[in-house]
């Protein structure tokens, strides 16, 4: 289309103002107009310039407004992440300007599934017109031109779209359909990218589906750390959206619940970091009785139910993704699990620094739910025994093993404090201080270990750790012989 064609003086009411980045700084409005008018008549182009320079220089980006929404979307589909302009290293970035986001198409666009293949666009319009003004209606068709039994409907406001969902979703079963009509918001670009990531993971997981953690691990070495990063990214996105079904479909994650998936991701990150140094490997393989920590929690092969996945197998798959399978055996896999609850003074003494770094890295990778996820793979008997004796107690450990924790969440109790600091060693006491007048937490407390090494591990990993809107401050409690206050 050429910009010289007849057009009104003003753009359409639904026209979109687009922001365009990765534009050569030497390009003028005229150069840009020639580029954009291939897709439709251009109403206005505004190059962003640095006014501090004389004369003002282009910042390499601009705003463009087409006369029609259709032209803007066609330009975006053809240029965004697709075309690299002369002299640039990255493709054009083209998206609606911030001022357009409040009424973005993706917020008003519905996907309609399970519709009769006999329906036309007009039939769909009639069906949904009672909920508000329809901006666009399109039935998806195959190469043969026949309907695929689904459509997209875009309303002029999000409220109209929400009303349509409430009224029409699963409200009727149409002719030739096996289940009720599906009405939901169409996938956004972010949703599509998330599904693409899940597909990539699924393909990689298929490579290891025939391998057994109890047998030959050599076949798992084909995967690298980038797939662990991909998994963590997908986990974070799905956790924030509350949709962990995507992960549940991945082998061998299918039988794990959300908390188990989160724990395994943290453990794999910790093991990957620790395995990169000799001392870290020692810390993994020398933890006392690590296999019992897993097997006593129902993780042995014989105790796995038919509808669940062995946590050790899942752990092995994640360790594989971290590129750390060379020379591993069942003991070393269990040793990695010990990072999440079995580390005592013997494990830390053979690689304290690197293990602390590994734990810190694991926590920071999934910080929004790490604190809640800590106890899941612990030896439950050990957890119960420690809980009875340590929660609420003010018993002190040896010199250098007693911690003062500030900035605890208001709702944290003794048990929460205990569970949060158990991964670093044997806790002899954990106490949150309560205001006697209000009976509410003072948001600080004490934790004591049976050895100073565990206390140092807790400080390095948990000092600055964010829980909600708060960052913990963890430091050693001062000696009784020190006259200074806490």
From Swiss-Prot:
GO terms for cellular component: cytoplasm; cytoplasmic stress granule; membrane; nucleoplasm; nucleus; perinucleolar compartment; ribonucleoprotein complex. The modification Phosphothreonine is found at residue 4. Phosphorylated. Its phosphorylation status increases in senescent cells. InterPro entries: CELF1/2_RRM1 (IPR034196), CELF1/2_RRM2 (IPR034198), CELF1/2_RRM3 (IPR034199), Nucleotide-bd_a/b_plait_sf (IPR012677), RBD_domain_sf (IPR035979), RRM_dom (IPR000504). Transmembrane segments: none annotated. There is a cross-link at residue 109 (Glycyl lysine isopeptide (Lys-Gly) (interchain with G-Cter in SUMO2)). The modification N-acetylmethionine is found at residue 1. Residues 284-309 have a biased composition (Low complexity). It is found in: Nucleus; Cytoplasm. One of its GO terms (biological process) is mRNA splice site recognition. The modification Phosphoserine is found at residues 179, 302. Induction: Up-regulated in myotonic dystrophy pathophysiology (DM). PANTHER family: RNA BINDING PROTEIN. Belongs to the CELF/BRUNOL family. This is CUGBP Elav-like family member 1. The lineage of its organism: Eukaryota, Metazoa, Chordata, Craniata, Vertebrata. The gene is CELF1.
